[in-house]
């Protein structure tokens, strides 16, 4: 995405006497036309000179806290260790410019924020320098910012940032605050101290599972063991009389057991028996799913993914074929799924990759509008795509709404493994033709597997479709009509090799098993398949060369 500095929409206001800068990450014109499409992050400098940054891309171990602060601190000329940060709440202004949702995923946090975040720091720096120029009578180009101070060209400290904030907040925002050259970087590419390590070591970091426990009940859910098949009946008589049990109620996902603490809820859950319907699909075991994928590869009706070059006109010296299969995979985040919901204040404490979706699912469970819900996002004990799906938030909201009091819902590790939104299974069949000089004169790749994006849209639909349908959902829905799912074929489509003829095609095979995004998405399986087959081709060429010698 290209964003010029002049298209960098700036708003400035006095907030408690401080300097607050809003800055857009959106494409040109979007912010002015509709604020809901203009993602905003906020840099605030208090009258005391404290720099506060809202982290709108969640921290789940990948370093976004450090990355975001480093970009701003580089241009603002402050020590990143002195910057205070807060996890951003839900706001349309924080929506990702590529996804149109307030979501962290796709490895784009630094890519889409690199220049806008630097611009925010540079703009604040320029305003502080201008304020210093007015107070000192010295030209601004003879002043420079260093470690929260403004100094003259001879190195003399003239002002601290705190002394300039009020005056700076009254200035017009410069249209084109200059960015530093790469040669002048002091932090970018050099600063390697993780700013989230200390709180994680000393225990002050708050994860979703660390939500406040005052007057909070704990819930676990007993679920049907096969997929998400519907429950038909349950027997809770043995569980109801166990110590600490508060309530046992049926929700959409199964039976929620609510108790005074997690252990009592879990022990009571073990005493409940369920009856459930198997569902309509026969594809509920590995053998049946594998057979369906094989049948799809044996058939036709493939959607073309990439077709380049001409098929070879001459016979190949050698033809190689291979078939690869990859299974469902659970994310197995270190921190199990959890969410705490207060139905009275309509607050949610959760570690989520998608705060706005969490608010929508909580609203669905509480039967309120999403804008009435406040999400307190926390550190994530692993995300990997799993925490973009807020099913556990819906469960917690349904239980809290039924009881009328705050509830913390916690999954077990077994829940996490059995009821994940899994990486989809995929089967690939590849065929390559080698020429006389060991060149690949034809590459054919057929893929069969479920549509990850269609499954994701279906899972999100209950909460998001009634009130709004983001453009990306509409686009992907249309994409599915053509039976091509880019999220399932990436890594196979973007083949990096200059083969003479490339033919890649995909066939959608739906299964009833819930699917979700995995780190690297389609590359997770397709990179393995493509590179393994390239290795097989290289091995075949090596053997041919050795034999010829």
Identify the role of each PLM range.
Residues 1-546:
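Structural alpha/beta core scaffold segments of enzyme domains
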Residues 549:
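Thioester-forming pentapeptide GCGEQ
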């Amino acid at each position: 995405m290209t964003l010029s500095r002049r298209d960098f929409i700036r708003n400035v206001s006095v907030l408690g006497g401080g300097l607050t800068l809003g800055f857009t990450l959106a494409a040109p014109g979007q912010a002015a036309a509709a604020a809901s499409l203009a993602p905003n992050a906020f840099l605030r400098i208090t009258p005391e000179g404290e720099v506060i940054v809202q982290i709108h891309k969640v921290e789940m171990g990948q370093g976004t806290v450090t990355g975001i602060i480093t970009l701003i601190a580089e241009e603002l000329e402050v020590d990143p260790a002195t910057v205070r940060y807060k996890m951003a709440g839900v706001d349309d202004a924080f929506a990702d410019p590529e996804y149109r949702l307030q979501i962290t995923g796709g490895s784009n946090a630094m890519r889409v924020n690199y220049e806008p975040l630097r611009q925010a720091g540079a703009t604040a720096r320029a305003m502080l320098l201008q304020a210093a120029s007015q107070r000192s009578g010295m030209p601004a180009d003879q002043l420079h910012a260093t470690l929260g101070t403004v100094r003259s060209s001879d190195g003399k400290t003239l002002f601290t940032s705190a002394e300039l904030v009020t005056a700076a907040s009254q200035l017009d925002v410069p249209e084109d605050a200059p960015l530093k050259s790469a040669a002048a970087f002091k932090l970018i590419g050099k600063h390697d101290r993780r700013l989230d390590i200390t709180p994680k070591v000393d225990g002050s970091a708050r994860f979703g599972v660390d939500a406040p426990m005052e007057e909070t009940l704990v819930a676990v859910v007993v679920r049907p063991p096969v997929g998400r098949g519907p429950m038909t009946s349950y027997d809770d008589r043995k569980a109801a009389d166990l110590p600490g049990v508060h309530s046992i109620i049926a929700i959409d996902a199964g039976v929620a057991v609510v108790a005074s603490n997690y252990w009592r809820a879990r022990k009571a859950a073990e005493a409940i028996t369920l009856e459930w319907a198997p569902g309509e699909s026969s594809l509920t075991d590995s053998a049946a799913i594998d057979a369906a994928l094989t049948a799809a590869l044996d058939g036709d009706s493939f959607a073309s993914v990439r077709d380049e070059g001409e098929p070879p006109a001459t016979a190949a010296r050698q033809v190689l074929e291979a078939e690869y299969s990859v299974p469902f995979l659970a994310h197995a985040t270190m921190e199990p799924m959890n969410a705490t919901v207060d139905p009275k204040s309509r607050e949610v404490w959760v570690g989520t990759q998608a705060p706005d979706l969490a608010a929508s699912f909580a609203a669905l469970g509480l039967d309120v509008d999403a804008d009435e819900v406040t999400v307190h996002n926390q550190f994530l004990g692993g995300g990997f795509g799993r925490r973009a799906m807020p099913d556990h938030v819906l469960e917690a909201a349904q239980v809290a709404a039924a009881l009328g009091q705050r509830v913390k819902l916690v999954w077990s590790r077994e829940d996490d493994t059995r009821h994940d939104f899994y990486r989809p299974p995929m089967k690939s069949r590849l065929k390559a033709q080698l020429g006389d000089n060991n060149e690949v004169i034809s590459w054919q790749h057929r893929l069969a597997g479920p549509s990850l994006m269609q499954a994701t849209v279906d899972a999100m639909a209950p909460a998001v479709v009634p009130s709004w349908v983001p453009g990306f959902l509409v686009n992907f829905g249309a994409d599915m009509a053509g039976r091509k799912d880019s999220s399932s074929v990436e890594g196979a489509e973007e083949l990096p090799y200059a083969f003479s003829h490339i033919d890649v095609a995909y066939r959608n095979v739906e299964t009833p098993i819930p699917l979700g995004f995995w780190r690297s998405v389609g590359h997770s399986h397709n990179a393995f398949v493509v590179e393994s087959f390239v290795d097989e081709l290289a091995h075949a060429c090596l053997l041919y060369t050795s034999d010829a010698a």
